[in-house]
A protein has these predicted regions:
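Cofactor-binding loop segments of dinucleotide-utilizing enzymes, especially the Rossmann-like FAD-
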Residues: 25-27, 97, 164
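Cap/insert and terminal regions of metallo-dependent hydrolase folds
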Residues: 89-91, 99-168
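Active-site metal-binding motif and surrounding structural segment of the metallo-beta-lactamase
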Residues: 1-23, 114-116
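A short alpha->loop->secondary-structure connector
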Residues: 13-18, 38-50
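Structural beta-sheet core signal
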Residues: 22-24, 93-94, 161
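Core dinuclear metal-dependent hydrolase active-site scaffold
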Residues: 49-111
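A short, active-site helix/loop in glycosyltransferases that binds the activated sugar's phosphate group
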Residues: 27-37
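A structural micro-motif
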Residues: 20, 45-47, 64, 90, ...
């Protein structure tokens, strides 16, 4: 279930928002504007699309900025991104979805060490979590794999697993 599905709650049937900023990469912007019910949110001005570009910092206000960066994932309808969130004195890395760390052209340990907090994909704990399912069809790094990669790190308390599913 794509993360974008929750946007429908901004529409007139639920919240009835007005010009709520929605930050989106190019392919997601096109998808939202071209497909209902999301296109209705744009038409009725429930949401206002704000464009994002890979590795381009966006200031949300005087104190907080975000930088989206592409990560390898299924990308059926749009790009998949993580975010670096920066405040006046702290930074956070947010990667809720990624296929496998080995497919990414970055060093996970280095990224985690460069930030104060890391919120990373914890969708599945291990290979056998969904008996009878081909886990390659729903790719995510297993928590045990991520813990193994991060084993050499000294400060592990800055890592928090998110995007948990109903089985873990």
């Amino acid at each position: 279930i794509g993360h974008y599905s929750g946007l429908i709650h901004f529409g007139r049937e639920v919240m009835g928002n007005k010009n709520t900023p929605v930050y989106a990469m190019p392919k997601m912007t096109k998808f939202i504007k071209s497909n209902g019910p999301w296109s209705q949110l744009v038409k009725l001005k429930n949401i206002k699309i704000k464009s994002l570009k890979n590795d381009k910092k966006v200031k949300l206000n005087k104190r907080i900025s975000i930088t989206p960066f592409l990560v390898p994932h299924r990308d059926e309808f749009s790009e998949t991104v993580g975010f670096k969130v920066e405040g006046p004195s702290k930074s956070l890395i947010y990667i809720p979805d990624i296929d496998k760390w080995q497919k990414w052209d970055n060093d996970l340990i280095k990224i985690v060490e460069e930030n104060d907090y890391s919120l990373i994909d914890g969708t599945f704990a291990e290979q056998d979590e969904l008996p009878g399912r081909d886990m390659s069809k729903i790719p995510h790094p297993f928590i045990v794999e991520t813990m193994d990669i991060l084993k050499p790190m000294k400060e592990k308390s800055k890592v928090h697993f998110i995007h948990l599913n109903h089985t873990n």
